[in-house]
Amino acid sequence: MRTKAAVVQDAAAAGLDGLFRARSVALVGATERSIWSQAAFANFERLGFTGRVHPVSRKGGTVHGLPAATSCAAIGEPVDAALLMVPEQAVAEAFADMNAAGIRNAVVLTSGFAEVGAEGARRQEALLAAARSEGVTLLGPNCLGFINYADRVPIWTTQPPLPVIPGGAIGVVSQSGATAGFIAAFAQRQGIGLSHQVSTGNEADVNVARVVDFLVDDPATRVIGLFLETVHDAPLLAASARRALSAGKPIVAIKIGASETAARAAEAHTGSLVGDDRVFEAVCRQLGVIRVSCIEDLVFTAGLLAQVGHVGDRRLGLVSISGGVCEMAADHAEAAGVAVPRLAEPTEAALRAVLPAFGTPNNPLDVTGGAMLDASLFARSLPPFGADPSLGLIACFMDLPDTAEDIAGYRGEIVRQIGAGFRASGRPAVMLSVMTRPVTEAGRALLKETEIAYLGSGVQHGLGAIGRAFAWAERRERGVPAARPPPTTAMVRPAGEQATLAYLTSRGVRATPVTLVRSAAEAVATAQALGGPVVLKIASPDIAHKSDIGGVLLDLEGAAAVADGFDRIVASVRAARPEAALDGVLVAPMRRGNGVELFAGVLRDPLWGPAIAVGLGGIWVEALRDTAIRLLPVTPGEVLEMLSELRGAKLLDGYRGSPAIDRRAAAEAVARIGDAALALGPALVSLEVNPLRATATGAEALDALAVWDEEG
């Protein structure tokens, strides 16, 4: 049986088909005086739109060379979509006219809505309510529109980069219309084609997540590129990203807001908060989204994936005509996390047979300057090089010629010989420029002739793109974690350390036993019953960081030490926090021996919902900030990945004589802590276990605290 979320997801995607594949369009507010109207109308001819275009103007007459209807209702025939280009105060009337004409898809260029404050947000809510009441799909407001290059449907209000690169396979979705244009322009200069470019603006209705879901099913799109300022429907975006990963469609995303300045700018631009950047970074890792920080890396990474696709063997062979470029490429490959293996002896022998006497068979392979005199050296050396069993992808560095004259000369011949060598090698291969450079129309023709995958990226951007493509392929091979059933709802609301540890124990998490005492005599009796050294900790609902104010004493043994410890801990806390309510003192057995203190904390992100952080625990949590984050629920396998991401991961495998911890036991404990937090419901603000003591024999929660929303 299909879930409700799946049904809603399909309905949302189906609703976009009528918009993005519209065959007739009304230009509402069309006028010769508007640069937006002029550009929108011209784009239909520029991109070869074969449908019908209907200018709509109150004054009627002729606009853009066509008779203008005075209203949408006056068009007199069915229309698939409308572009609203009217002033903000006229949007409601224009929308009502569009509805009356039965138009069920709208693109709203007009600004002055949620991005300008509370009053604008109210206007946007009213617009959305009107759209939903009539079943209208609404893109915008405050957006430039979209171009469906694959089906030649341009409802876009600025001039796109021309000429259009045919066969584009990258769908670009941006909350910023201008940035969508910048991405499209840079891609066009690099000879990289798009299938779609979509500006979502304020996202009153259609948001990035819905467009991603549409593109996952779009046959023309092989890679999806995103520019995000915020996320308006995190659950749907997560679901769409999972679908994309399963379908083998990489998502490459820029998400701004890592800095406070960028977050403020984004809020001013879209009227939305950007959310916690650490959580978004975790979402990318978890769902296989490739995160980049600039337009160049978005275009080059998406362009590589669109051309080369999934590479199963992620070991790289580097080839150049320059030894210096080979060395530079090797450095950047290592920085990108890409393995450049040694060649097998048979490969070296085969290369010696074709290289000049002064050449050295190696990876990276310097084919030497001899290729300037005899370009066939590439065609003869690339096949034995590519036959090496250790290689999965070949990257050859050579600038693409720019002019017809160059292409007719030796530079063009070198590229043709590289293409022949690529084809004969039987390996996936890409040619990269040495420095970032555009691709001319003549260069594109040569690439088509030679069937070469190419990036004008330069060494650093190109190898970064390869590293990201390899990482995505590895993530995809691990697959999408199977959906876990939600944990059984807990009918308790633990408050304080003792109750929280007891609750965790009931959910299958091993936790240290603690006893609440209210006198030195009770502390001594409890310690004697435990039969060994103990820990004393203050119990107070008002104190979170007990050790900061002398609220924790370790390794107390004997009646005198325990009694004195009780008095000291109470006195210390009363002196530091006289206003704090004290419930008493907790007595717990002291855990000695080798082990690593971990931290496991569940938080509720306002955009993404419950997430869990894992890191080195104890006093190191805030000092080192070495944590990995995932959305809940998590599997033990996902927690193992999180542990391996920590900067201090070496400590988990034993350090300077200490034994390695049982990572699987620790991962199981963390996954159960996550499930335990989910079971407590939405009123839980956070659940922290610190420390979670991990040893060679298991993991045990030594301290825990649940924080609740008082209004929940």
List the predicted regions and their residue ranges.
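Catalytic-core regions of core metabolic enzymes
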Residues: 1-712
